[in-house]
């Protein structure tokens, strides 16, 4: 099932310039999700990271993995209209390849464990069939205030 940007914006609260998932290519609710982020030179982080050689910041790659996992949570629960997903911890993060404008990040997240409102994920970012980043993280689902 492909999920376009308009539905993504219905599922998570992030907006430009911090919306870091462009499209979901495949989703298996309660299991895994794959999406993409097209990296373009006109994104604001590249004015300072780095002006003469733009490089996608690692923290934004981690954020893209977390956003994709939040979409998976939204599609796995019966209703997320009154729920929010919050990042609790990040573990074993590794950056293995530079990501730069013109690259397409293929992001994949898998649910490792779910207990009540705490979910654990393994995620990775691939560019041209190479691992660019990988991480494990934990998120908490809370009622909206």
From Swiss-Prot:
Swiss-Prot/TrEMBL catalytic activity: a (3R)-hydroxyacyl-[ACP] = a (2E)-enoyl-[ACP] + H2O
Gene3D superfamilies from the UniProt entry: Hotdog Thioesterase
Any Pfam family: FabA
Disulfide bonds: none
Catalytic residues as annotated in Swiss-Prot or TrEMBL: 49
PANTHER family according to UniProt: 3-HYDROXYACYL-[ACYL-CARRIER-PROTEIN] DEHYDRATASE (PTHR30272:SF1)
NCBIfam families, alphabetized: fabZ (TIGR01750), PRK00006.1 (NF000582)
Role: Involved in unsaturated fatty acids biosynthesis. Catalyzes the dehydration of short chain beta-hydroxyacyl-ACPs and long chain saturated and unsaturated beta-hydroxyacyl-ACPs.
Family the UniProt entry places it in: Belongs to the thioester dehydratase family. FabZ subfamily.
Protein name: 3-hydroxyacyl-[acyl-carrier-protein] dehydratase FabZ
């Amino acid at each position: 099932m492909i999920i376009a940007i308009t539905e993504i914006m219905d599922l998570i609260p992030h907006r430009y310039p911090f919306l870091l998932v462009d499209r979901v290519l495949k989703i298996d609710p309660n299991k895994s999700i794959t999406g993409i982020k097209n990296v373009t030179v006109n994104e604001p982080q590249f004015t300072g990271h780095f002006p003469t050689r733009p490089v996608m910041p690692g923290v934004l790659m981690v954020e893209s993995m977390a956003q994709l996992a939040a979409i998976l949570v939204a599609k796995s629960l019966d209703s997320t209209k009154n729920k929010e997903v919050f990042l609790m911890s990040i573990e074993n993060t590794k950056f293995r390849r530079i990501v730069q404008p013109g690259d397409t990040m293929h992001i994949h997240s898998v649910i490792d464990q779910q207990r009540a409102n705490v979910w654990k994920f393994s995620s990775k970012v691939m560019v041209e069939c190479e691992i660019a980043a990988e991480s494990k993280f934990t998120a908490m689902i809370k009622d909206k205030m």
